[in-house]
Design a protein with these regions (language model features):
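Surface-exposed, interaction-prone regions used to assemble/regulate multi-protein complexes
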Residues: 1-138
Length: 138
């Protein structure tokens, strides 16, 4: 993938204003071919309860991630409520080769993902159209 294409995609990601935003979900689908990251969005400096950002990594050639399971002691991520979700610290794209790019994602709590994919897309979606794992929890 060419450098200017990577810069354009990085700009689109940066426009989500993801820094310190809550990660509403992370999905790895189709045996790792697609990875979707759902990020809380803001409207006029307030959390947008209707919409969120969906950053999709498509045609993934490699996926590597580390979690904070060793540091979490007894609680499980599946038991998180919306107020206890991870926040995003960094999403950076870089050249990998002519067809792929490398993405590094850092979430607070020592969670790190490295993804080599053919494409990255960014879209704003309605939260009501997605069944987040933390819904309906106290």
């Amino acid at each position: 993938m060419r450098e200017f294409e990577i810069r354009e995609k990085q700009d689109k990601i940066n426009q989500t204003d993801y820094w310190d935003g809550r990660i509403l979900d992370l999905q790895i689908l189709y045996f790792g071919d697609e990875v979707h990251l759902y990020i809380e969005s803001y409207h006029e400096n307030k959390v947008d309860l209707e919409e969120c950002w969906k950053v999709s990594f498509l045609a993934c050639a490699e996926l590597n991630y580390e979690t904070d399971a060793q540091n979490r002691k007894k609680f499980k991520v599946k038991d998180f409520t919306q107020n206890h979700l991870y926040t995003c610290q960094e999403i950076s794209l870089e050249y990998y080769d002519d067809s792929f790019l490398k993405t590094t994602i850092v979430l607070e709590g020592l969670v790190m993902l490295n993804i080599i994919s053919r494409d990255v897309t960014v879209a704003k979606i309605k939260q009501s159209e997605h069944d987040f794992f933390w819904r309906n929890k106290s």
